[in-house]
Amino acid sequence: MQHPKKVVLAYSGGVDTSVCIPYLKNEYGISEVITFVADLGQGDDIESISQKALNSGATKSVIGNLVEDFVEKYAFPAIRANALYGEKYPLSTALARPLIAENLVKLARKLNAGAVAHGCTGKGNDQVRFDLAINALGPDLEIITPAREWKMSREEAILYGEKFGIPAPVSKKSPYSIDVNLLGRSVEAGFLEDPMQEPNEEVFAMTSSIDDSPNYPKDIEITFKNGFPIAIGNESLSPLKIIQKVNYLAGKNGFGRIDMIEDRVVGIKSREIYEAPGLLLLIKAHKELESITLNPDVLDFKNLVEKKWAQLVYQGFWFGPLKKALDGFIDATQTSVNGKVKIRLHKGNAIIIGRSSENNSLYREDLATYSKDDIFDHKQAEGFIYMWGMSNKIWAELNSKMNN
């Protein structure tokens, strides 16, 4: 098969994507390999990673500062959607993939490349997310996936790279597979593959252990406007600053760890450890504010939408038509999600201790109270109950006659 002479490769600096560079040139006959390094707030030395790509044989290396887009266009919509895959995982890794894919396609267009490539294996979720996003945004582009096609073990891949001047990792190989960005960390493999093995503290980096977290609780107040978090306490902050601050506060107090059995897109179950302190806290606060500002029927239906939205994003359909339609529903619900939520952080817990909405609260104290200020008309309850239970009463009468 004849491949384009120029390809844009999603590059992380790891063994697989480094080996992809000479592999694409020598096994696929590609002349120019341009690497794209995404800065998602992972804390790495991005310039060094970019230089490593050049040292590994890349024709050119491009750095994309995607942190603000990551927060505003991906994390914040997930907060409004209360997105938790499997009712636990806030999609911290999954949200990054369509953003990287989008920028891969943009760079390929800009440089007139006929193909894009990534280093995902055939066993994980990311291959699905990348391929579906690229097909949606650049259906004419070829997608090349060397790590899915070569039959090399990790050790063999390292030896292959050494032939082309790519040094082997100098440190002892970590037993874990780790992915990090601003929103969180995912950790798998090693002894964690035994679902009964408790993770030790070396697995975690964004959150304190219960023993090491402060002995005294920390209360914080989060303000939302149209479903978006806009302030912590009395301080209005940019979206990026909000994520950074709640990451610190929640993580310091031991909140934000997830240990779960996850159903992967490819059909297998895997044991995953996640840290996502800020994202989890903001989703928790946002959902609480919705409880006071949205009607019961809207809340019930939104619960269904949220589950499907999270599934679609996890499964790679960020740019799909159903996800777009669900976005429209979520947008329509958020115009009244304005107010404040108070949370107490302590020893791994995030406890809601208050919520308010000055202009959009559906909570009426004069209707809910049992004091003398109660204005609820109790006499209306009898007629309501009669109508509400009519169908059950008819059914019971009919069955009583049949049984006799």
Swiss-Prot record:
Species in which this protein is naturally found: Prochlorococcus marinus (strain MIT 9515)
Gene Ontology MF term list: argininosuccinate synthase activity; ATP binding
Recorded family membership: Belongs to the argininosuccinate synthase family. Type 1 subfamily.
Matching CDD domains: ASS
Principal cellular location given in the protein's record: cytoplasm
A single GO cellular-component term on record: cytoplasm
Protein's name according to its UniProt entry: Argininosuccinate synthase
Swiss-Prot/TrEMBL keywords: Amino-acid biosynthesis, Arginine biosynthesis, ATP-binding, Cytoplasm, Ligase, Nucleotide-binding
Enzyme class: ligase
Binding-site list for L-citrulline: 89, 125, 129, 177, 186, 262, 274
Presence of the UniProt keyword Methyltransferase in the record: no
Pfam families: Arginosuc_syn_C, Arginosuc_synth
GO biological process: argininosuccinate metabolic process; L-arginine biosynthetic process; urea cycle
Location in the cell: Cytoplasm
Catalytic activity: L-citrulline + L-aspartate + ATP = 2-(N(omega)-L-arginino)succinate + AMP + diphosphate + H(+)
Domain of life: Bacteria
Subunit text: Homotetramer.
UniProt cross-references to InterPro entries, sorted A to Z: Arginosuc_syn_C, Arginosuc_syn_N, Arginosuc_synth, Arginosuc_synth_CS, Arginosuc_synth_type_1_subfam, AS_cat/multimer_dom_body, Rossmann-like_a/b/a_fold
